[in-house]
């Protein structure tokens, strides 16, 4: 029983330490990850994971090792912010893999990327043919940024001489049958208005709604549990 309790305490402490360190280091540890970010997060996770199941290592040692690793990563991140020359070495640099519509084979080979991988990355960026691309930049996080050729670029309202309209963010009002009350205030509506809108759609209870979204000047969008099960 004592061993189980010890593992439980170490897991909770390890989780808390990792969470605090990631909050301090910023979102780059789990979003838009670079090779260095990946290595640092992997080692930090392994450090705590191995320590949890090694009964000879005490909680104080886990905390010390994790905090020391966090401090080292923070120092390196600080250096990359202050010294531009260090960024290329630690984080890498963007590379142009398509320039003026032409594939840059040497750059692709240098970055260990083949045609199939490039096509997949282009599709994720919204381009389904290499012929549509004027420039494609392989970013340090492994994603591709695309500048389409003018013939394939989407026309803007300005191009079509259409008067611009103000835009607003869609706001989720119901998730899993529960009203998100903070979002009601954000949308400038109340619970009574929401129930009235649901009645217009022949929905009697909010518990029947899987998802509901408000968007300015648009009707309330809803998906009921019944609808989701029938598709």
Swiss-Prot record:
One GO cellular component, as annotated: plasma membrane
The keyword Transmembrane helix is assigned to this record: yes
Keyword Ubl conjugation applies: no
Organism lineage string: Bacteria, Bacillati, Bacillota, Bacilli, Bacillales
InterPro entries named in the record: DUF421 (IPR007353), UPF0702_alpha/beta_dom_sf (IPR023090), YetF_N (IPR048454)
Database matches in PANTHER family: UPF0702 TRANSMEMBRANE PROTEIN YCAP, UPF0702 TRANSMEMBRANE PROTEIN YETF
Key words, A-Z: Cell membrane, Membrane, Transmembrane, Transmembrane helix
Compartments (UniProt record): Cell membrane
Bilayer-crossing regions: 5-25, 33-53, 59-79
Family of this protein: Belongs to the UPF0702 family.
Identification of the protein by name: UPF0702 transmembrane protein YetF
Membrane topology: Multi-pass membrane protein
Gene that produces this protein: yetF
Organism of origin: Bacillus subtilis (strain 168)
């Amino acid at each position: 029983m004592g061993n189980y309790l010890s593992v439980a305490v170490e897991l909770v402490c390890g989780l808390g330490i990792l969470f605090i360190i990631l909050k301090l280091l910023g979102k780059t540890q789990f979003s838009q990850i670079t090779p260095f970010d990946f290595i640092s997060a992997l080692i930090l996770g392994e450090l705590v994971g191995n320590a949890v199941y090694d009964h000879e290592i005490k909680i104080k040692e886990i905390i010390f090792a994790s905090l020391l690793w966090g401090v080292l990563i923070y120092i390196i991140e600080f250096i990359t912010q202050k010294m531009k020359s260090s960024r290329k070495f630690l984080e890498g640099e963007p590379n142009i893999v398509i320039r003026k519509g032409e594939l840059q084979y040497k750059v692709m080979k240098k970055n260990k990327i083949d045609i199939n991988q490039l096509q997949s990355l282009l599709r994720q960026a919204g381009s389904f043919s290499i012929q549509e691309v004027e420039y494609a930049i392989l970013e340090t996080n492994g994603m591709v940024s695309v500048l389409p050729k003018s013939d394939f670029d989407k026309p803007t309202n300005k191009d079509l001489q259409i008067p611009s309209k103000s835009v607003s963010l869609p706001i989720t009002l119901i998730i899993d049958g529960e009203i998100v009350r903070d979002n009601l205030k954000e949308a400038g509506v109340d619970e009574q208005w929401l129930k009235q809108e649901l009645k217009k759609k022949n929905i009697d209870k909010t518990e029947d709604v899987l998802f509901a979204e408000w968007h300015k000047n648009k009707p309330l969008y809803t998906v009921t549990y019944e609808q989701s099960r029938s598709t």
